Amino acid sequence: MAVYRADQAQVTFMTEPAAGGYVEQAPKDTAKTGSGADTDLDGNHEAGSTSLTVTDSTGFSVGDAILIGYWHDSTTATNENEIRQIEHITGNVIYLSAPTAFYHADGGGTDNVFEVTPTTANLQDADSQYINLIPGAYETVDVPDPEMAIEGRWFLGTTSKRAFYAAYSGQQTYAGSIGGFALLDGKALRYPIGKVYSTTTFTNDVTAMKRTFAAALKKGDLYVALGGTSSDAAIAVTTKVMFGRGSETSEIRQSTSVLASASAGTIRLDYPLQFDHAAGDMHVIGTAASNTTIATTQTIPYTHSIKETVDLDSVSWHVHMLPSDETRANAFDRRYYGGKIGSMTISGEEGGMVTASWDGVNFLGMIHNQKTVDLSTDITTPFFADMQSIINSKVDFPTNEPYYFSQGEVTMFGQTIARIRSFSLSISNNEEPRYYIKKQMGRKRGPTEIREQRREYSLAVTLALPDAAAANTAQRTLFQEMLLEGNYGSATDFIRTGKKGFDVSITLTRGNVVTGFEDKITITIPDDGAAATGGNQQGAFIRTAPHNITEDNPFQVEADILFRNLSITVQDAEHYYP
């Protein structure tokens, strides 16, 4: 008999435009339900909406699948759509199984909400799937299936024999983790830190390499209406374009389809936008010398900069388990939405690969594809919803070699540390799920939001001491830095000078690629690489570095280092970072 096997399971992820708004669409041939209901939105609805206000809810029922927006395919779509289940209806307000991922405009009298009956083929449409990224080479995953707080209650009475009288359900907690995955690229690194913006030098401002877009774009948008005239740069399928050039909201996408005209129509992007963009220019990725677009076979370097933000973006996870007989109709799919990656560790040790782990990820809720429970009267399983089954052929499996510890470099207080044996960098946002009073339908009792608290960084380093001669020169040592406590004032003036701390740089390099540039991840502490005295300016400080006498030779020290912030820069051949 067919069974579910660990080596036939995959976990993929994707950034959400709004908390809980998992990203996917529905194909054009998703059938409207017979004479099913349809209506139009009454007012604009932002991404992250948990309910819809419509002009007429007549004909809709709890449990119905509804399509919000319009059908799409590669030749006719001009806006985003998505499918959600109806959880409750009050008047003309429809409550949804999960928040929306996209902005949906007022219908204005034109129907843009439809009752639909998705087929198996509709839910295996590779063109509609976006939750298809792999964090790295992982082996095990703690999935965030709900933890049910069911408690027995003791009431006054004479027949319970000291046992509880009745059990009641409390809150639901969704917490998971992915430990120790090998870093194949830097896409997993930004989530406990903040935003990522991408750029390349292969753009310029000549007319032939620019194209306007007619209207402002929102975070999450997949479709871009082209402005300008037919004499402007044509955007063909596979053309890469940059939005927000020269800013910290710059991002690069690839055109996957062109609707109506490559010069005056609408293009569809390979992934949703991560930032809002005012109407303006987008720049074509091309060779600066010839003002021509890059050939699809040409590899060019992209730089991805990760910087701190107060609010963290949320992610969706999709768990796809294919049975051993490979019958896709029996696949077991679960999706977790609204996840905040609150803590992460980046580590490496001699002889191994550099790894990362998402140590604590809290989610808002989940959906799955196990529709009915076989009881005397079949009931719909709680949290069931129609969704895309993320198939293997659509998953963006990295083809890169991993980053190796032996190809890295660590510098501290201006010195390259030659004898690092291991390092472990930890980030914690101390996030807390909050359970506010809110109208939740069905059996939902999960968090209403997840809030970040104080952010904390630390770095643990194990290193062998330098040669004895170096310890008696002007070269600064770990022991000296520990005693200085980051204060480099004179013996008589150190109080007024104040603490400064020192800079740390961790560089991970992956050999030369075909074009001659190196894939590289650079972690800079503090974020600007320039520790200084004063608030929000300090660098790193050694808290402990005991020079114990052990059996290790040469002499080995384990240092614990505190620092206040960092930035990460990644250079590789990936145009898109989520």
What are these regions (language model features)?
Residues 1-44, 55, 59-87, 91-93, ...:
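Signature of extracytoplasmic/envelope-associated structural regions
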Residues 50-52:
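Structural beta-strand segments of beta-rich domains
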